[in-house]
From Swiss-Prot:
Lineage, top ranks: Eukaryota, Viridiplantae, Streptophyta, Embryophyta, Tracheophyta
Subcellular location: Nucleus
Pfam families cross-referenced by the UniProt entry: ELK (PF03789), Homeobox_KN (PF05920), KNOX1 (PF03790), KNOX2 (PF03791)
Protein name listed in UniProt: Homeobox protein knotted-1-like 6
SMART domains in the record: ELK, HOX, KNOX1, KNOX2
């Protein structure tokens, strides 16, 4: 499990790491009723996810190597005091974070009422964290610090892995529900249901056949009219579609065409007046028409070019000419 999440636990805590993340540590639907009943106590944090359950899981992960946690809890007969281990974990500054990550895992896939209850328990845990000051501090036991930090991160990643299939399934079901709703709506519209959603037998016998025949005749007439119009104007419609597809947005030149015009501008900055031959070449290179090219150069010269004082006035743009906006 450590390798799966790219974590490396301390040597004294790694052997039993899989116990913390095993499926047996999560709640099943059969456990929800017990959770609802046990949540009536005054301290639901301790009753539901306190020393009894979460600490037992953590201690199980530590029991085989717990003798190396700190010298003061070693015994000559090599028997580990689980009570001392639980106390050290519960007093660690990272324990509230471990509890929160554990509750987040339990909330994945839980029914709404269970999820709400777990959120209340989590809020009570936040209040409990503010009232209780941990009796230990970081650095007092580096190996325990690393254990707590590692498994907090593992639980966060584990919760993400648990939530992913639930999120994908929820998205899929929502799409299916929307498709079914649209399908049912389309069927009801096609059948022409009444205001209360029920078609009376009188309507079916008297008006149903007439309406179906009328709709069928109307569809045939529409199809015939469409075929005649396509035969008569099909070529013209194709030509118009081609022209519309080639037409550029008004005042907005393609980026490649604008770059080609800028390249020509930079090369002829001293006299940026393209000849007719230059305009034809630019039109072939950019796909623009003569009017677009003329407008671009007029705007470019008005905005970014100032003729020298000794330049003949006749060679300049006519000051009364039209001003076109490119963008």
């Amino acid at each position: 499990m450590d390798g799966m999440y790219n974590f490396h636990s301390a040597g004294d805590y790694s052997d039993k790491s899989v116990l913390m993340m095993s499926p047996e540590s999560l709640m099943f639907p059969s456990d929800y009723q017990a959770l609802l009943c046990s949540s009536a106590g005054e301290n639901r944090v301790s009753d539901v996810f306190g020393s009894d359950e979460l600490l037992s899981v953590a201690v199980s992960a530590l029991s085989s190597e717990a003798a190396s946690i700190a010298p003061e809890i070693r015994r000559n007969d090599d028997n580990v005091s689980l009570t001392v281990i639980k106390a050290k974990i519960a007093c660690h500054p990272s324990y509230p974070r471990l509890l929160q990550a554990y509750i987040d895992c339990q909330k994945v896939g839980a029914p709404p009422e269970i999820a709400c209850l777990l959120e209340e328990i989590q809020r009570e845990s936040d209040v409990y964290k503010q009232e209780v000051v941990p009796s230990s501090c970081f650095g007092a036991d580096p190996e325990l610090d690393e254990f707590m930090e590692t498994y907090c991160d593992i639980l966060v990643k584990y919760k993400s892995d648990l939530a992913r299939p639930f999120d994908e399934a929820t998205c899929f079901l929502n799409k299916i529900e929307m498709q079914l709703r649209n399908l049912c709506t389309g069927v009801e519209s096609a059948r022409g249901v009444s205001e209360d959603g029920v078609i009376s037998s009188d309507e079916e016998l008297s008006g149903g056949d007439h309406e179906v025949a009328e709709d069928g005749r109307q569809r045939c007439e529409d199809r015939d009219l469409k075929d005649r119009l396509l035969r008569k104007f099909g070529s013209r419609i194709s030509t118009l579609k081609l022209e519309f597809s080639k037409k550029k947005k008004k005042g907005k030149l393609p980026r490649e065409a604008r770059q080609a015009l800028l390249d020509w501008w930079n090369l002829h900055y001293k006299w940026p007046y393209p000849t007719e031959g230059d305009k034809i070449a630019l039109a072939d290179a950019t796909g623009l028409d003569q009017k677009q090219i003329n407008n671009w150069f007029i705007n470019q010269r008005k905005r970014h070019w100032k003729p020298s004082e000794n330049m003949p006035f006749a060679m300049m743009d006519d000051s009364s000419g039209s001003f076109f906006t490119e963008e």
